[in-house]
Amino acid sequence: IWNTFRDFLEACKILGINNEETVEVEASMKKLSMPTIANDGRLMEWTEELEETEPGHRHISHLWGMMPGNRITQDKTPHLVDAVRKSLDYRLNHNYHAQGWSLGWVTSMLARLKEGDKSLDMMQHNYFTKAYPNMFVDAHGRPQVGDMMGVPLAMIELILQSHTDYIDLLPSLPTAWKDGKVTGLCARGAFVFDMEWKAGKLISTNIKSLKGGKCLLRYEGKVKELTTESGKS
């Protein structure tokens, strides 16, 4: 809900809209509960610290702000990222019921948390061992497409992330992917990337801007700002 309200207000700002509806959304946004950390360091799922009846439950709705949302980031809220990590580790360490579409969510969450090897391991053991020839997945005896849809997103998140002010290159590269090449990866801000790496290190990057403007790149902690022109690489 918070992300929806924020995106709505940002869109209204860009479009120059300021009316009763925007005022109402702003007021409602202030009433939303803020992310809270429990005494054990995990991100709280509820407004109270309630005992879980199923510690390994597959749903991770309270971690939405980390993935696919971007309210929780390492740059701005590192303490909440730590809480998300503890929450996910807790689920995975308590006989996590990995099945169905939640597999895609957790796989992508691990990629965003820069747990590349864990993310790839979940892809290989929980997807590719259960996949049907048509790429549907065996979800408790029934074919399901939703969980496999999470695989491309997780793969991209391992190689490129653009949910913050920066575009991070190879942020979560798995050890097994020491050499590789990708073309046509789209990043927020209307940028298209081609990249190649050897021995886990980036050796070339080509960036095409579809609308021009500033591009903030980050690789291994170093930031480079580029001024781009529409339609040019």
Give the predicted meaning of each segment.
Residues 117-232:
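Non-catalytic C-terminal accessory modules of carbohydrate-active enzymes
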Residues 2-166, 203:
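Active-site core of glycosidic bond-cleaving carbohydrate-active enzymes
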